[in-house]
């Protein structure tokens, strides 16, 4: 089966399973997922499955990407903060819908690979940086939308809530542990947060700080 046929099959699966927003479907169609997975998994790029990308991280299942993007309720004037760049695929999808994407990754090698992909695909409205996602990006705040692509514990990080604009939406997996996570949509109001629990998921945990880098191999003397 050709890559084009695999992509069409995946888009049909997404439609059958609740991804109905034409802007989201168009963005997923535009972004070549095979660019964001290791070469070993190129033949699985358009399967509806999460795939390993190294450093204990995964590229999310396309259905999860589609549904989480859809519930953000996006339009082309928005600035979006993404926590957890990973392969860069989710940020790339967002970039085809909104004005600007800010994305934070704690693993330097993943960030460098993602930035290379953004440049290759000429996705110039994405700004990425290495950092602690739990602290957000205060100098660029407030954001109209925040998407967290890692399990955020029982409550959303306080710094991210502060950086969400009034009227803005945050979509984040929350739960006491990985076995009990749910995607939650939070809308910031003048008086606090309105919470809507959506569907169960399993994401890698949201961790503080920048990940330590593996030590360089010593040169042979």
From Swiss-Prot:
Superkingdom to which the source organism belongs: Bacteria
Entry's EC annotation: 2.1.1.77
GO molecular function, one term: protein-L-isoaspartate (D-aspartate) O-methyltransferase activity
Active site feature: 60
SUPFAM superfamilies: S-adenosyl-L-methionine-dependent methyltransferases
GO BP terms: methylation; protein modification process; protein repair
Family annotation (InterPro entries): PCMT (IPR000682), SAM-dependent_MTases_sf (IPR029063)
Gene Ontology CC annotation, any one: cytoplasm
Compartments it resides in: Cytoplasm
UniProt keyword Transferase present: yes
Keyword Cytoplasm: yes
Pfam families to which the protein is assigned, alphabetical: PCMT
Gene3D superfamilies documented for this protein: Vaccinia Virus protein VP39
Keywords: Cytoplasm, Methyltransferase, S-adenosyl-L-methionine, Transferase
Catalytic activity, as annotated: [protein]-L-isoaspartate + S-adenosyl-L-methionine = [protein]-L-isoaspartate alpha-methyl ester + S-adenosyl-L-homocysteine
Role description: Catalyzes the methyl esterification of L-isoaspartyl residues in peptides and proteins that result from spontaneous decomposition of normal L-aspartyl and L-asparaginyl residues. It plays a role in the repair and/or degradation of damaged proteins.
Matching NCBIfam families: pimt (TIGR00080), PRK00312.1 (NF001453)
Protein family: Belongs to the methyltransferase superfamily. L-isoaspartyl/D-aspartyl protein methyltransferase family.
The name this protein goes by in its record: Protein-L-isoaspartate O-methyltransferase
Annotated source species: Rhodospirillum centenum (strain ATCC 51521 / SW)
């Amino acid at each position: 089966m050709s890559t084009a046929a695999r992509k069409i099959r995946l888009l049909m699966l997404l439609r059958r399973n609740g991804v109905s927003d034409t802007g989201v479907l168009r963005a997923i169609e535009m972004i070549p997922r095979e660019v964001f997975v290791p070469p070993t998994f190129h033949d699985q790029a358009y399967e509806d499955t999460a795939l390993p990308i190294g450093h204990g991280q995964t590229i999310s299942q396309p259905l999860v990407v589609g549904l989480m993007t859809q519930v953000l309720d996006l339009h082309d004037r928005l600035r979006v903060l993404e926590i957890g760049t990973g392969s860069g695929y989710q940020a790339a999808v967002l970039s085809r819908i909104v004005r600007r994407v800010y994305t934070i990754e704690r693993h330097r090698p993943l960030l460098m690979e993602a930035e290379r992909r953004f440049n290759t695909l000429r996705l110039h409205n994405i700004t990425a940086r290495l950092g602690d996602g739990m602290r957000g990006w205060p100098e660029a705040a407030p954001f109209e939308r925040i998407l967290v692509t890692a399990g955020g514990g029982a409550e959303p990080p306080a710094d991210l809530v502060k950086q969400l604009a009034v009227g803005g939406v945050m979509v984040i997996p929350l739960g006491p542990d990985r076995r009990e996570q749910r995607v939650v949509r939070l809308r910031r109001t003048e008086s606090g947060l309105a919470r809507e629990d959506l569907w169960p998921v399993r994401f890698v945990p949201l961790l503080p700080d920048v990940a330590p880098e593996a030590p360089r191999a010593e040169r042979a003397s």
